[in-house]
C-alpha cells in the first residue's frame, strides 16, 4: 500500500455528538477552528433519545454532515444500565456512588470503534468526543488512561493513524460551559436529562451537574425543568 493510500486529510474530523452540552460545545469549537466535521450520533436504546433530535437539528443549522446510527440491536448485550433498562434513573449529584447505575457497559469503546472506522473511511485525522474531568469518578471509559490506550489501539488496528482526542479531559462541565457561553452558544439546543420526558427532570445526576454549571457561571439555563433538586 503506497503512502497516498494511507495519508489522512488534515483538519478533517469525526465528532461523536450526543446532542448534550459537552459534545455541543466541542462540535461548535471544531467548526469555528475551521475543521471539516462529520458528526456521528448513536441510538443505543437510551431512554433520553430526545438528545438525538437535538443533535439532528444542531447539525442541520450548522450545515455539517451528520449520521445517526441505530445500534439498538446490541442492546440486549448491554444490560444493567438505568439509561437503557427498566431501572429507575438515580437522583442526586453526578459524582455520587449511586450514579454508577447509569454506566452502559463498554459504551464508549463501542462507539469510538465505530467512529474510528468511519474516520478511516473518510481519511479523517482524528475522532473527537466530549469526555470531561467530571466523568472520571463514574465512567471508566472517560478517564485519561482509556483515551490514551484507545488512541493507540486505533493506530495499531488500522493502516491510517487516526487519533482519539478528548479536549475536555481535564476540564469540568463548569469550564466547558464557560467556553460555550464565551462563544455565544445557545444551550437551549441541547438535551442533558437522563429521563426521556417532555421537560428535563432537574433531579437526575446529569441535570444536577448541568444546573450547577449554569449557576457557577452566573447564567440562566434556557431549558425548562419539572423541578430543581436543591439537595
Swiss-Prot record:
Pfam families xrefs: QueC
Pathways involved: Purine metabolism; 7-cyano-7-deazaguanine biosynthesis
GO terms assigned for molecular function: ATP binding; ligase activity, forming carbon-nitrogen bonds; zinc ion binding
Cofactor: Zn(2+)
Keywords from the UniProt entry: ATP-binding, Ligase, Metal-binding, Nucleotide-binding, Queuosine biosynthesis, Zinc
Catalytic activities: 7-carboxy-7-deazaguanine + NH4(+) + ATP = 7-cyano-7-deazaguanine + ADP + phosphate + H2O + H(+)
Superkingdom of origin: Bacteria
Gene Ontology BP annotations: queuosine biosynthetic process
Binding residues for Zn(2+): 193, 201, 204, 207
CDD domains on file: QueC-like
Cofactor note: Binds 1 zinc ion per subunit.
Keyword Kinase: no
Record's keyword annotation contains Nucleus: no
EC number: 6.3.4.20
Residues the entry annotates as binding ATP: 17-27
Alphabetical list of NCBIfam families matching this protein: 7-cyano-7-deazaguanine synthase QueC (TIGR00364)
Protein role: Catalyzes the ATP-dependent conversion of 7-carboxy-7-deazaguanine (CDG) to 7-cyano-7-deazaguanine (preQ(0)).
HAMAP family xref list: QueC
Name of this protein: 7-cyano-7-deazaguanine synthase
Species, as recorded: Hahella chejuensis (strain KCTC 2396)
